[in-house]
């Protein structure tokens, strides 16, 4: 609206097409790119796990540690602060140092370790000790998206990212229900 389009006209997608406006159309686009299926699965499963966490945490915290809504809210606020720190300050540095592939592995490993700590924590302080480790899980998402964009042509990158957003939304709908 205020800033001009930065993408050169030669690299822009063709005009709007109703064929691409189907609700599952963007997800069907992923079928044409088998080289990214593994990375797409990582995006879906990581987001699936992410969406289960806030929807069940209050119940888990009460059953495991006797934390009520107030304490659970404080913990979720800390999770949010740690997420901001990782996203704003650490991801770029870590990816520069490790590269995307290793950053994905580190991020996913930290997520697994964090969830293992959460599940085996016998006390609240043990659970809280897992928060900084689990926060590093956020490294995986942008690195995965970067690798996906490297695997497809520039003419479909926006549509592929849209398809990923659709899958993330689908995970957000399905995961809490399970």
Positions of PLM-derived features:
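C-terminal transmembrane helical hairpin of 12-TM major facilitator-type secondary transporters
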Residues: 101-144
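Juxtamembrane intracellular "pre-TM" segments in multi-pass secondary transporters
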Residues: 4-40, 64
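Intracellular helix-loop hinge segments at the cytoplasmic ends of transmembrane helices
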Residues: 59, 143-151
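A late C-terminal transmembrane helix in Major Facilitator Superfamily
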Residues: 155-178
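Short amphipathic helix-loop junctions that connect adjacent transmembrane helices
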Residues: 55-72
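Helix-to-loop junctions at the C-terminal end of transmembrane segments
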Residues: 86-100
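Small-residue hotspots at the loop-to-helix junctions and early N-terminal turns
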Residues: 69-77, 162
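Pair of pore-lining "gating" transmembrane helices in MFS-fold secondary transporters
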Residues: 32-53, 132
């Amino acid at each position: 609206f205020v800033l001009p389009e930065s993408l050169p006209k030669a690299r822009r997608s063709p005009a709007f097409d109703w064929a691409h406006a189907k609700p599952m159309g963007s997800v069907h686009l992923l079928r044409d790119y088998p080289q990214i299926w593994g990375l797409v699965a990582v995006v879906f499963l990581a987001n699936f796990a992410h969406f289960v966490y806030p929807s069940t945490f209050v119940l888990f915290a009460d059953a495991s540690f006797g934390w009520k809504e107030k304490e659970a809210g404080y913990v979720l606020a800390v999770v949010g602060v740690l997420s901001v720190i990782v996203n704003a300050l650490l991801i770029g540095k870590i990816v520069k140092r490790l590269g995307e592939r290793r950053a994905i592995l580190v991020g996913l490993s930290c997520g697994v370790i964090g969830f293992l700590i959460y599940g085996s924590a016998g006390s609240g302080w043990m659970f809280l000790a897992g928060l900084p480790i689990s926060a590093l899980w956020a490294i995986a998402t942008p690195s995965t998206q970067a690798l996906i964009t490297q695997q497809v042509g520039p003419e479909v990158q926006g549509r592929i990212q849209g398809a990923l957003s659709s899958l993330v939304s689908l995970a957000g709908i399905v995961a809490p229900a399970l």
